[in-house]
């Protein structure tokens, strides 16, 4: 069988399975997710063994420490995948929900009911936990899912998908409901993007190159999980202890994820005190600073920033730092360089916080909190499918409702149109 035929068959099986999934009861779907969670925990040793193969290959390829961290599975992360599935099982099922009914003058009643999208294709890189997270959300929302992970995580993804498919089979549900493209051949992505007869939506998660390739080559609608150029702005009257804590957490806790801070903006009236302070703290934690001229003056040893630094998603212990004239300048900078992911203001000035919330147009805007909270699980959505930076049809962390659409339902008593 050619690669083209293989991908087409895989997508067709997912489409066939989606018709069954759309009718599966909430109880069965919840049992499925809980069973998958138990199965992942039971397979921890085997999953870590397969993940070790990917980590070794990654080291041989020279992947950065941050990228290896994204790739790594340990007991805690496998437990986290299982916990995420259990949390999704506890969430309300959106399928079948009627969102409003109204009566027309002729007596007919019109409403809208949530239904699954059908088949969702997820194309992602590095993080093998996406395999379980995406499967859980898609299946709970009544959708079949076709997964294509990065070649660097192929052993981990195959192992996770195998565990999850085993639970589908045990409950008598169609195996085609969860499909993994098992080849590392990049041509498989191109073929997947041609399956408009069988796949309803593509969600790419990864670097800028992947997102651009998918957007330019897909025949299927795409929701972009674009790069996370997340900004934090420290206002003139910010609590500096709070600002330090937020900035350190946003940059250092997990620098290789999309909700890590990549650019720090500091009000000029706070700069004399805060720039040396945060530079010292971050430097001790191994962060390389790339700053404007004023930052370099206040924090000797800072690397002078170039234009490309302001729009960079480093995914590493590197931070762009700029001193700005005030809130107007901070907002203008963010509007120019933002990827519409997450932006933060640290301030004790209520009017400034409200203006920041109104004028910043990113999918998540925060006041006095770390950008690391920009996550579906942290928002109570359960494990997320991604953080959409596309305003249609979803914006921000995507949960169950974002994997459904609505159809109109009409009740009559024999009315005909005059």
UniProtKB/Swiss-Prot annotation:
GO MF: glutamate-5-semialdehyde dehydrogenase activity; NADP binding
Annotated metabolic or biological route of this protein: Amino-acid biosynthesis; L-proline biosynthesis; L-glutamate 5-semialdehyde from L-glutamate: step 2/2
Keywords: Amino-acid biosynthesis, Cytoplasm, NADP, Oxidoreductase, Proline biosynthesis
EC numbers, comma separated: 1.2.1.41
Record flagged with keyword NADP: yes
A GO biological-process term: L-proline biosynthetic process
InterPro entries for this protein: Ald_DH/histidinol_DH, Ald_DH_C, Ald_DH_N, Aldehyde_DH_dom, G-glutamylP_reductase_CS, Glu-5-SA_DH, GPR_dom
Location, primary (coarse class): cytoplasm
Name assigned to this protein: Gamma-glutamyl phosphate reductase
